[in-house]
Amino acid sequence: MKHTLSVLVQDEAGVLSRISGLFARRGFNIASLAVGPAEQIGVSRITMVVQGDNRTIEQLTKQLYKLVNILNVQDVTNIPSVERELMLIKIQVNSQNRIEALEIVKIFRANVVDIAEDLIIVEVTGDPGKIVAIEQLLTKFGIIEIARTGKISLVRTSKINTEYLKDKVVAYNA
């Protein structure tokens, strides 16, 4: 099972290197990684997605706490949270299919950030499922390049699960 870990660290040189070294020694692959400043000055948030069962992730968490500069480790996999990714995707278009490509972009509430006669660069943000879905639909146009961030995540203050919210929005709009 994939787990999303949110790790708060002191923003100092070598922290990410020590974390990646721990993962390498244990034979873990980091499927997704995003690092950036947290809400507190001098603290960074690392959001990573790793594969493993609950016991393995618990052991990994204990090992992370043993590293210098680790302030907090939280497995947010089963906690209601907001998850987002960003993808830039450059696709091949022509006069016959440009409108269809732009309609897909519009449906996904994505943005065209660059356009040329035969190429479009699209920026899309959303949960990982949305990113995968638009990528699959745009594949038929010919993908030239993709740049995709790792997943970022914050625990919901409301503690309400996203799936619950989707059901309520659908019922409300019906």
From Swiss-Prot:
GO terms for biological process: isoleucine biosynthetic process; L-valine biosynthetic process. It comes from Porphyra purpurea (Red seaweed). Pathway: Amino-acid biosynthesis; L-isoleucine biosynthesis; L-isoleucine from 2-oxobutanoate: step 1/4; Amino-acid biosynthesis; L-valine biosynthesis; L-valine from pyruvate: step 1/4. PANTHER family: ACETOLACTATE SYNTHASE SMALL SUBUNIT, ACETOLACTATE SYNTHASE SMALL SUBUNIT 1, CHLOROPLASTIC. Dimer of large and small chains. Disulfide bonds: none annotated. Residues 4-78 form the ACT domain. CDD domains: ACT_AHAS (cd04878). It is found in: Plastid, Chloroplast. GO terms for molecular function: acetolactate synthase activity; acetolactate synthase regulator activity. Its EC number is 2.2.1.6. It catalyses: 2 pyruvate + H(+) = (2S)-2-acetolactate + CO2. One of its GO terms (cellular component) is cytosol. Belongs to the acetolactate synthase small subunit family. InterPro entries: Acetalactate_synth_ssu, Acetolactate_synth/TF_NikR_C, Acetolactate_synth_ssu_C, ACT-like_dom_sf, ACT_dom, AHAS_ACT, AHAS_small-like_ACT. Gene3D superfamilies: 3.30.70.260, ACT-like. Chain A, domain 2. The keyword Amino-acid biosynthesis applies. This is Acetolactate synthase small subunit. Its main location: plastid. It comes from the Eukaryota. It holds the Pfam family ACT_AHAS_ss.
